[in-house]
UniProtKB/Swiss-Prot annotation:
Any single biological process term in GO: translation
Name under which the protein is recorded: Small ribosomal subunit protein uS14B
Cofactor field: Zn(2+)
InterPro entries linked: Ribosomal_uS14 (IPR001209), Ribosomal_uS14_bact (IPR023053), Ribosomal_uS14_CS (IPR018271), Ribosomal_uS14_sf (IPR043140)
rRNA-binding recorded as keyword: yes
Function: Binds 16S rRNA, required for the assembly of 30S particles and may also be responsible for determining the conformation of the 16S rRNA at the A site.
Domain of life from the UniProt record: Bacteria
GO terms under cellular component: cytoplasm; small ribosomal subunit
Source organism: Mycolicibacterium paratuberculosis (strain ATCC BAA-968 / K-10) (Mycobacterium paratuberculosis)
Pfam families reported for this sequence: Ribosomal_S14 (PF00253)
Gene Ontology terms, MF aspect: rRNA binding; structural constituent of ribosome; zinc ion binding
Amino acid sequence: MAKKALVNKAARKPKFAVRGYTRCNKCGRPRAVFRKFGLCRICLREMAHAGELPGVQKSSW
């Protein structure tokens, strides 16, 4: 889990727009966040395997 101070800092609007960044809504991780879901790759994978994300399925070809 991310530190609460860093999560709160990311939630504030930055002075300059380019300084803003996304964080995972579930765990607060700052890297590898999918904008469509608002989740990091780890949480996205866990929730997809658990069937908590409708329309997401494991690819197979």
